[in-house]
């Protein structure tokens, strides 16, 4: 018999249940079919960034071009974020979710416009079927504008998160330069069109699930970002849609996973494409992932780079739009496999 979800705010409240609540159960046509998922193998490229600013830069830029155009996802090693910074971030994030609920729910909100909030599922006010995920989401650039609203417990949370966010932002800026070059653009092109830039983080907590075949941590979706940089623990759960099938991405220690978001797809005029991915859960182990989402500022105007558009053989696929228009559309819906970008296609003549 399905467990009642009334009066419970977080999915972690149900982790010890025998069955998942009925409002987490996906229709039969929309279940993860875990037995049909392929193991990762060489599912996404692994790129070594050690010489990104050395004599092999052109080689690495070409590797990025290939990964972005063929996969939309890649892993990176020798990325410049110190291991100690990464380890502290994972430790304090897990400590946050292991606190008593009375401490965690101080930050609870179902309002997606809040710049720091604990919540559950994806957009709990719009999701018709809930997802087996709790999350803390926060804005982190400029850090001084937001740090005082971040959780103060665990006591080291703000200091550790600020150190991590600063280090990952530096990595993102290096990647954006290289990706700009991979498109044949000036290295500062993408950074310049993002306005003041915006950086968000999410701390995704996926508790053990008694019936993982019936639900998702997050269903298939594409990111609204320019790029996303994902730190995950050693519990498998990320899956990428490649060649008409779902492929599991096995965690590799000391790496990040990077994926192209919708805004990069627009800027590149479809040369690089945002890719469907999802998170699944399991019966035995909790899973923690920490994505950094990099966005334009809300007043930035996004559109295909002029250098990638011509009237002969490369017409603009998307119209230009203020990023706030996309942002509002993205959050006024549940998470869906259909991309928001369909609403931003350029008119055809």
Swiss-Prot record:
Q: Name one GO molecular function term.
A: dioxygenase activity
The entry summarizes the disruption phenotype as follows:
Impaired production of 2,3-DHBA sugar conjugates but accumulation of salicylic acid (SA) and its sugar conjugates. Precocious senescence. Enhanced expression of senescence-associated and defense-related genes.
- Which keywords does UniProt give here? Dioxygenase, Iron, Metal-binding, NAD, Oxidoreductase, Plant defense
Could you mention a single GO BP entry for this protein? leaf senescence
Share the entry's pH-dependence remark. Optimum pH is 6.
What does the record give as the reaction this protein catalyses? salicylate + NADH + O2 + H(+) = 2,3-dihydroxybenzoate + NAD(+) + H2O
Q: What is this enzyme's class at the first EC digit? A: oxidoreductase
EC number(s) of the enzyme?
A: 1.14.11.-, 1.14.13.-
Thermal activity characteristics from the UniProt entry: Optimum temperature is 40 degrees Celsius.
Induction, as annotated: Induced by the powdery mildew pathogen Erysiphe cichoracearum. Accumulates upon infection with the downy mildew Hyaloperonospora arabidopsidis, the powdery mildew Erysiphe orontii, and the bacterium Pseudomonas syringae. Present only in or around the main veins of cotyledons and leaves infected by H. arabidopsidis. Induced by salicylic acid (SA). Accumulates in senescing leaves.
Q: Which residues bind Fe cation?
A: 221, 223, 277
Locate the Fe2OG dioxygenase domain: which residues?
197-296
Cite the cofactor comment.
Binds 1 Fe(2+) ion per subunit.
| Annotated positions binding 2-oxoglutarate | 206, 287, 289
Cofactor names: L-ascorbate; Fe(2+)
InterPro entries for the chain: DIOX_N, IPNS-like_FE2OG_OXY, IPNS-like_sf, Oxoglu/Fe-dep_dioxygenase_dom, Plant_2OG-oxidoreductases
Under PROSITE patterns, the record lists: FE2OG_OXY
What PANTHER family has UniProt attached to this entry?
OXOGLUTARATE/IRON-DEPENDENT DIOXYGENASE
Q: Which protein family is it in?
A: Belongs to the iron/ascorbate-dependent oxidoreductase family.
State the protein's purpose: Converts salicylic acid (SA) to both 2,3-dihydroxybenzoic acid (2,3-DHBA) and 2,5-DHBA in vitro but only 2,3-DHBA in vivo. Component of a negative feedback regulation system of SA levels during senescence. Regulates both onset and progression of leaf senescence. Negative regulator of defense against Hyaloperonospora arabidopsidis.
Name the chain's protein. Protein DMR6-LIKE OXYGENASE 1
Q: Which species expresses this protein natively? A: Arabidopsis thaliana (Mouse-ear cress)
Gene for this chain? DLO1
